């Protein structure tokens, strides 16, 4: 309850202060308007007095000029004796025109004063418009600067995130490469060991003999071209599974190139033959499966033949 009372009293006090400020603002506006009205009335009265005095002064002057002009006209008519009454009439008309022009002067002065007031008001309004325009431009620049800063922060975060992702990707590829190299090294060691020590009848050999056996294995596959897996294992005193493992390893590391068919045979394909098939496809653009098989049989020697024969077919 005490907290509610404090909140209630605070709200009442805030509303009271706001109401007082509004009332004071209204009173101030009222007195400002009243003073402005008084100043305007005083200026109008002063202008009217000044115009009246000027009018009276002009009338006297005009009267004097009219009398003098009339006297001059009379003397001129007496002396000359040749002019008629039309000259006097024209003179009177000219004097009346002068009087009308003098009477129109106060109206012109009043219009000029009003014009000066409107001009000053327009000047103040233009000044206020320029001030508002400057404030709007300043606010717009600040808003644009704020947006640019936010955009720069967002781009910086995106760049940092991208750099982190690239670093993670680099580390991942590095780990995969190390694991692959390690696995290949282990498989290579295992392959050398199986060539060096064989359970089917090979005696233990040294590293040089193991290398020779591996080289003989590769040369046998290349020369035979179409290798029967069972015959390959029997030739090197290996089990069929071991022979298949060795072929897969040599194909995986790029030493041999070929395919394993469903009849238990490995067909060795040289890089020249692969390039010839690729060239045939690129030249023909679109080929059918039958055409590809027929041309592949021509290019890929299924028996041990020299490379020059394949080159001749490719050139043809």
Curated annotation (Swiss-Prot):
Q: How does it sit in the membrane?
A: Single-pass membrane protein
Q: Which domain of life is it from?
A: Eukaryota
Location comes to: Endoplasmic reticulum membrane
Enumerate the Lumenal topological stretches.
1-3
GO CC list: endoplasmic reticulum membrane
InterPro entries recorded: DDRGK_dom-contain (IPR019153), DDRGK_domain-containing (IPR050899), WH-like_DNA-bd_sf (IPR036388), WH_DNA-bd_sf (IPR036390)
Keyword presence, tRNA-binding: no
Residue ranges of the region described as Disordered = 147-187
Matches recorded under SUPFAM superfamilies = Winged helix' DNA-binding domain (SSF46785)
The record places the following residue ranges in the Cytoplasmic compartment, namely: 25-316
User: Per the UniProt record, which residue ranges are transmembrane?
Assistant: 4-24
**What are the protein's GO molecular function terms?**
ubiquitin-like protein ligase binding
Q: Which UniProt keywords apply?
A: Endoplasmic reticulum, Membrane, Transmembrane, Transmembrane helix, Ubl conjugation pathway
Please verify whether the record's keywords include Transmembrane. yes
The text of the family note is: Belongs to the DDRGK1 family.
What the protein does comes down to: Substrate adapter for ufmylation, the covalent attachment of the ubiquitin-like modifier UFM1 to substrate proteins.
Protein name, per record: DDRGK domain-containing protein 1
The record lists the lineage as: Eukaryota, Metazoa, Ecdysozoa, Nematoda, Chromadorea
């Amino acid at each position: 309850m005490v907290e509610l009372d404090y909140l209630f009293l605070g709200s009442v006090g805030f509303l009271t202060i706001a109401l007082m400020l509004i009332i004071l603002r209204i009173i101030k506006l009222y007195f400002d308007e009243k003073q402005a009205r008084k100043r305007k009335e005083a200026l109008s009265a002063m202008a009217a007095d000044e115009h009246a005095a000027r009018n009276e002064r002009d009338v006297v002057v005009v009267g004097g000029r009219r009398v003098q002009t009339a006297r001059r006209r009379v003397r001129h008519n007496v002396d000359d004796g040749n002019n008629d009454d039309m000259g006097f009439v024209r003179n009177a008309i000219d004097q009346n025109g002068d009087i009308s022009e003098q009477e129109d002067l106060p109206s012109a002065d009043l219009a000029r004063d009003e014009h000066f007031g409107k001009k000053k008001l327009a000047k103040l309004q233009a000044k206020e418009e320029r001030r508002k325009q400057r404030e709007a431009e300043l606010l717009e620049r600040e808003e644009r600067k704020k947006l640019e800063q936010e955009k720069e922060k967002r781009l910086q975060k995106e760049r940092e995130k991208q750099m982190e992702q690239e670093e993670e990707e680099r580390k991942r590829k590095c780990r995969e490469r190390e694991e692959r190299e390690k696995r290949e090294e282990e498989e290579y060691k295992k392959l050398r060991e199986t060539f060096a020590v064989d359970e089917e009848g090979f005696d233990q050999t040294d590293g040089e003999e193991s290398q020779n056996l591996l080289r003989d294995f590769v040369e046998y596959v290349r020369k035979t071209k179409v290798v029967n897996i069972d015959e390959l294992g029997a030739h090197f005193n290996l089990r069929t599974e071991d022979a298949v493992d060795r072929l897969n390893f040599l194909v995986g590391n790029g030493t041999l190139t070929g395919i394993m068919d469903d009849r238990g045979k490995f067909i060795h394909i040289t890089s020249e033959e692969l390039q010839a098939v690729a060239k045939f496809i690129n030249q023909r653009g679109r080929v059918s499966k039958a055409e590809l098989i027929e041309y592949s049989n021509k290019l890929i020697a299924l028996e041990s033949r020299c490379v020059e024969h394949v080159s001749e077919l490719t050139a043809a």
